[in-house]
């Protein structure tokens, strides 16, 4: 069962102290069991347990476990239920939760829903101190926590939390789940001083002395990863298990700052007697698998019309980019390069960003009410861009110009529709994947409301298996990441894969697959031969039986 955690948590908060009436159906079944610690199996007295009807979001109930961790919900109609639990030191979580998926509880005749052992996973935490080369605390440093998961089907390291160090240089991340984490710190030396173009000229006697002093203070901290790496490839992973307490102290090392001058060729505008600049070039760097992060320690200013200067940047490899002024087509640009010492770049010598526009045609069903968005996701950086669909069926990404790269394209807020065809001018299409090199791109998208559904049962030795990872694998998986579907088999072994575009697929069920690169064709190959092939046409509903591997 796929989790709808945001909705579930909001509902739980709204329903505190309340029990919504049961849906109108024959009642008489129970969900009962014991809440325990996942490692020690110690009963958790006072744990909070909630259920939500999968097909009726208005129905929910909440109880508190007794002195021996027992809980019970009675007089329930047959159906599927989401089971959630929390306690002191245990964040809210689903039953056998894996990322956004968990085991749903099936209730009905001949189904055992009364002997549940709900193993809550204790919170973990990471704390530490950020210091400089002399062991002094670095105050007000920005500390970022990254987690590596396989939620996208391949290793993906993304920021999950951030914190600011206190006056002792300390930070804390609490209420963490098990997993692999990395800590990074961005800061500016408190004593750093950077050249100011507005300062008055100095005398011949003062200039050499001040120049020497400024050289000593013209420094920056690189983005630093635990324990003291200046590149994410050298970061040490913190592998947390339930209830772990990890310490990650980080030492920052000051280095001579880069001086970057960017000439955009843009002329300033004047309005009401004031000079108006159209924003600053952005300075970013890639970390881990390609995630883009802004350089928060940099300090930029406009030296003159069309010229920008940056200080406070440590030597390294960066991306400098700027959107087109005033939304002019083909005006945006980017450049990835190594920076050290004093560097000047000219916008006219840099590759252009792409200006993406297009149309969307909806087939097979009326257009849903409300706003609809077209989403572009960069395969390398995971950067997501959104453009709103107009009432006339057009969209425009020109205000957030697109970097060259490979993109997946999907719809958001268009329930019941999936993109089936993509036509592009100025870009290359490979099935459901878009390869953009720059310049002007026009897209023609067709989305269909004729979507199917695949229901099934995961089996092991001809018996239903709960908690298996179910993966719907499309043909040519590399070019069709948006067609993958996943679920976790429920307590009766059943699963449901919704909003499936017609086509040929293979359904596989994996007993211990949650840490696999499930979208990698090489990883999938050994499992596909024992999967269940399906050929979905139109809005058909199929029922399949899948052997757990």
Q: Regions from the language model: what does each represent?
A:
Residues 2-549:
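Long luminal/extracellular ectodomains of secretory-pathway precursor proteins
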């Amino acid at each position: 069962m796929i989790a709808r955690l945001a909705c579930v948590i909001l509902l739980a908060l709204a329903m505190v102290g309340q029990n919504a009436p049961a849906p109108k159906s024959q009642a008489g079944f129970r969900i009962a069991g014991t809440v325990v610690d996942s490692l020690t199996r110690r009963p958790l007295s006072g744990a909070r347990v909630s259920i939500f009807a999968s097909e009726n979001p208005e129905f929910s109930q909440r109880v508190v476990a007794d002195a021996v961790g027992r809980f019970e919900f009675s007089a329930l109609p047959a159906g599927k239920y989401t089971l959630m639990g929390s306690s002191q030191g245990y964040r809210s979580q689903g039953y056998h939760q894996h990322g956004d998926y968990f085991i749903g509880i099936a209730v009905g005749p001949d189904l055992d829903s009364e002997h549940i052992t709900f193993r809550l996973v204790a919170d973990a935490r990471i704390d530490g101190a950020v210091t400089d080369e002399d062991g002094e605390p670095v105050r007000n440093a920005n500390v970022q926590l990254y987690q590596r998961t396989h939620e996208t089907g391949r290793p993906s390291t993304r920021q999950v939390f951030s914190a600011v160090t206190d006056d002792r240089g300390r930070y804390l991340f609490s209420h963490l789940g098990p997993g692999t984490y990395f800590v990074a710190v961005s800061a500016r030396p408190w004593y750093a001083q950077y050249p100011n173009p507005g300062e008055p000229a100095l005398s011949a006697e003062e200039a050499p002395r001040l120049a020497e002093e400024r050289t000593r203070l013209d420094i920056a901290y690189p983005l630093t990863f635990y324990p003291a790496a200046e590149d994410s490839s050298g970061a040490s992973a913190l592998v947390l298990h339930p209830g772990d307490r990890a310490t990650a102290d980080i030492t920052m090392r000051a280095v001579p700052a880069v001086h970057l001058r960017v000439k955009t060729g843009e002329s300033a505008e004047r309005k009401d007697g004031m000079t108006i600049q159209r924003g600053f070039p952005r300075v970013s760097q890639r970390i881990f698998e390609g995630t883009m992060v802004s350089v928060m320690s940099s300090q930029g200013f406009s030296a003159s019309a069309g010229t920008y200067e940056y200080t406070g940047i440590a030597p390294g490899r960066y991306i400098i980019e700027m959107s087109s002024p005033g939304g002019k087509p083909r005006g945006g640009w980017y450049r990835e390069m190594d920076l050290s010492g004093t560097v000047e770049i000219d916008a006219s010598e840099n590759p252009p960003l792409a200006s993406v526009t297009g149309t969307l045609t909806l087939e097979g069903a009326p257009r849903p009410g409300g706003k609809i968005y077209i989403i572009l996701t960069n395969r390398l950086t995971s950067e997501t861009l959104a453009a709103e669909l107009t009432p006339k069926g057009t969209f425009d990404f020109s205000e957030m110009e697109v970097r060259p790269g490979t993109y997946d394209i999907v719809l958001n807020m268009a329930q019941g529709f999936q993109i089936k065809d993509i036509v592009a001018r100025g870009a290359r299409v490979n099935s459901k994947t878009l390869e953009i090199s720059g310049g002007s791109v026009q897209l023609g998208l067709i989305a269909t409301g004729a979507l199917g559904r695949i229901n099934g049962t995961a089996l092991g030795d001809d018996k239903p298996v709960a908690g298996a990872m179910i993966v719907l694998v499309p043909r040519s998986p590399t070019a069709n990441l948006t067609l993958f579907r996943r679920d976790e088999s429920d307590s009766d072994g059943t699963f449901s894969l919704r909003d499936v575009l017609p086509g040929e697929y293979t359904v596989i069920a994996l007993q211990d697959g949650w840490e696999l690169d499930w979208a990698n064709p090489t990883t999938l190959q050994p499992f596909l031969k024992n999967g269940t092939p399906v050929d979905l046409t139109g809005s058909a509903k199929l029922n399949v039986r899948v052997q757990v591997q």
